[in-house]
Amino acid sequence: CCGPTACIAGCKPCC
């Protein structure tokens, strides 16, 4: 779940 919209998707650990 990482990518340009990771934070928006709620994948905080991926930020």
Curated annotation (Swiss-Prot):
The modification 4-hydroxyproline is found at residues 4, 13. Disulfide bonds join 1-15, 2-11, 7-14. Transmembrane segments: none annotated. GO terms for cellular component: extracellular region. Expressed by the venom duct. GO terms for molecular function: toxin activity. It is found in: Secreted. Keywords: Amidation, Disulfide bond, Hydroxylation, Secreted, Toxin. The modification Cysteine amide is found at residue 15. Its main location: secreted. Belongs to the conotoxin M superfamily. The cysteine framework is III (CC-C-C-CC). This is Conotoxin tx3i. It comes from Conus textile.
